[in-house]
Structure formats: structure tokens, C-alpha cells
Amino acid sequence: MVPKKSAEPKLTVAELGRWRLVEQFQKRLAASAVGRAEHRSFADPKRQLQLGEYLGLFLFGLLNPAVRTMRALCAASDLARLQKEVCGRAVSLGSFSEAQAVVDPQLLEKVFTDLAQEGQEAKPGRAGGLPWRIVDSTLWEALPRMHWALWRRQGPTQSAVRLHVGLHVLDDQVDRAQITTGRGCERRTWRASWKPGEAYIGDRYYGEDYQLFGELGALGCAFVLRLREQASFEVEEELPLSAADEQAHVIRQAWVHLGCKKRYRSIRVRLVWVQTPKEVLLLVTNQEVATLSADLVAQLYRQRWQVELFFRWIKCILGCRHWLAESPQGVAIQIYLALIAALLLQRHLGRRPTQRMWERLELYLLGVATLEELEAGLARETARLERQAKTKKV
């Protein structure tokens, strides 16, 4: 069943400047919290900082270019406008820090999931008639004192947090997310998220366990995964190439079995060799040629750059390089809020903001740019992107 399209009105540039995004988030939070049990401390009459106020202030800190630390955020809560629109009262360091221990990150995960599903629509033109999703993960460096996030010991001890995502190719939108420590296995996390009938695109690490291919096939899932150059395989049948395949720089395709030993052998899969300026890519899929031609296999894998751009954007533009909370719950809260902010911005601007768009928004929020200059800057950047897209099509 296709989710109904949201009737929520599109925000104007001026409304973005008035932090209507925080207001929209708080409304969605309240809707998602219905029927869920809150921590008992929120029922205590002595508690002044409520759930929506805490998370709204946290989100404000992620979005605002002038706020980089928890101390700065709490100091800003003294401002009358911020109290009126976001947090209701001045918030002390102790109250803000303590709140992370009583907020369930699964509530934010639900807000994120509901928001992502709300924006998905059935669209024509899916390759092979399948909803392709790019899977990948990225690391955030954690502070040495965040011992729970121990990642590895290469020289000094290193701590990190890993975000695993699934990015819907046609919507260019992350609709799945899972947070683990840096040691969290990418394949294990991906496997836990499988759903029958879905289609996945992944890099080399996801293609290292050949036994997963049979499990994916049993679920009715399709995949396009990259293999390492050293992959061992036995050719069962060479396949011809079409003119479209050759135009997509496909140099060979064949049905093969992967694995050098019988116990490691994969099911029969189709291996596609794609020539790039630097190297030859080995791409594997379980789809028949009639369902997914070799040129489409190459084109699908090239879409992986979308998830890399998303990681760069959420880290650099949303400012997720500074931890406003350091516990496992606090870190999960910060990352889920960043993901929610990314979806809200993408929804209300009609696209994921580029770095130039985000810089202009920040200048406006700092009072350097006027509303007219903000609107003109966003219009120029949008026009540039449209011209760029037309040039690529030609």
C-alpha cells in the first residue's frame, strides 16, 4: 500500500528562518509518542524540562550555526525568543545533560521512520521494477573518554560511532538508519534489515560473504554488489553484450559460481565487468539479463555516490562533528535528530540543500543576509543545479 502524501503545507523561506522546522518536529514527536510509555521521571511535578522542549532545544543546537557546544546551547536558552518558540524556559547544564538518560532513542527512530515512509511514493522507471536501496555505513570519531564506543587499537586507542543507512535511489532519501559502535558489523546490521522483495546496492565489504547471496535469493531479494579484485570464481556460461552494455563500458558478463572451495561456493550469480578510468569493477547480481541488463547493473552501481554525498552533507553541513551528549543514548539522540532535520529540510526545500544553500541559510540566521538576499541566493543555486542537470542529460 502506498503511503498517503502528507498534506503538510510547504514552508516558505521566511518560515525556515523562524525555526518552523523545530515546531514541525515537535508536532511529529507528539504524534509518534502517543501510546508510548515515557520515562517515569517525566510525570514528576518537579521536572520542568519536558521531552519536547529538550529535544526541540537539541535540534535547534544542531541547526543553528552559532551554537557548537552544550554550554553554548544552554546559555542561549536564556533568550526570550528561544524560550517562546522552542524550550519554554532557561535550561541549565545539569538539566540538559541529565535528560539524555531518560529519553528513549527508539522514539526518535520512529519519528524518523514515519517521516521517511511518508515521503515515499510508487514511481515508474525502477530498474527491473524493483525499489533499489543503497546500503552503506559511516563512522563518527568519538572522544577518548567515550569508552563504550571503543573501535580499535592502532597506535592510540580509537573510539567511534557507526551509522548504517539505506538510501532509496529514486527518492534520493535515507529511509533506514541503525546506530552501533564503530565495531558494529556492516553485513550483520544489513542482514537484520532485509525485507522480502527488496533490492540492494552495496560496496565490496557487503559482497565478501558469498553465502549471503543464497539467503537473499531465498527471500526474493535482488542485489548488485561489488566484489574484490581477488575474488575467485568458476565460469559457467559466457554471455553476449549489447550495444547499450558496451556504451556503459561493460566489457564482459558471465554466469559464475564464486568461491575457491566447495563449502564457500555461492549460488549461480551473474558477474559483470565494468571498465572505469582507474580500474575494472567486478559487479555481481542474481538477476537475469532480461530483468536487469548489464548496462543497468553498471548504472545502478554508479548511484552509490548518492550515499557518499549524504554522509558528507550530514557530517559537514549539519555540523555533526561536535557531540552535544556523550552517552550511548545521547549520541543516538543527536544522530537521529540530524537525520530527522535532513528529511525535514529536504521535504520543505524540495531537494537536499547544497553547501551553498546551507551557507546562505546560515548567513540569514546570523543576520548577515536579508530575507530578499536569501531568496535570491537560493533561486540562483536552484537555477544552476537545473542547468547542470540539463547539461548532463544532453
Roles of regions detected by a PLM:
Residues 95-120:
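Short, basic alpha-helical nucleic acid-contact segments in DNA-binding proteins
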Residues 1-72, 89, 100-103, 110-111, ...:
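Single, function-defining residue in the core of a domain
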Residues 68-86:
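DNA-recognition alpha helix
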Residues 84, 121-122, 152-154, 212-213:
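Catalytic micro-motifs at enzyme active sites that drive phosphoryl/nucleotidyl and oxygen chemistry
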Residues 82, 117, 146-152, 183-184:
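Short acidic (Asp/Glu) patches
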